[in-house]
Amino acid sequence: MRFIKLLKYFFHKIYRNLYTFAKWGVLSLAAGLVVGGCSSLFARCLRFVTDFRTSHTFMILFLPLAGLLIVFLYHIFQYKNDKGTNMVLSMIHAETELPFKMAPLIFISTLITHLFGGSAGREGAALQLGGSIGNQLGRWFRLSEQDRRILVMCGMSAAFSAIFGTPIAAVVFSMEIVSVGVMY
């Protein structure tokens, strides 16, 4: 009798582990495809606008107008409380909600900034883009808050990997940036 209980327990554990493995395999594949595709498009557009600006140096004269355009976009999207990458990290630590409208806003505003010669890095944009899309995928799949946080990290890794072409470094970077300031 005890052997049968032990056998049931063993098979239940195997089933649960296989279910978790399959669930995260599908979710990470979806996040990788969607976020990776969007981030690859972002990287191509970024290269295009940077090359265009390099060959048309007069574009920098319109940088103040580009800044006004970006402020106008933030106003249209009704996005007043932009904390940048910190918002993505706060979502992972369960402090704030991550809006999906952050993704197109970051995509467009970073391209405008680069087109007119502004100073903006790709790292923050990658993390915000990937985190925002990953969080939205988690909502669409109706995941728990804890699972959505993991999907946000998957999205951050996928975006970072697609933009910089470094998949292993992207995973390590996402785990590292989430653990900053946490002592074990």
Question: Which residue stretches match the model-derived regions?
Answer:
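Alpha-helical transmembrane segments and immediately membrane-proximal extracytoplasmic
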Residues: 1-184
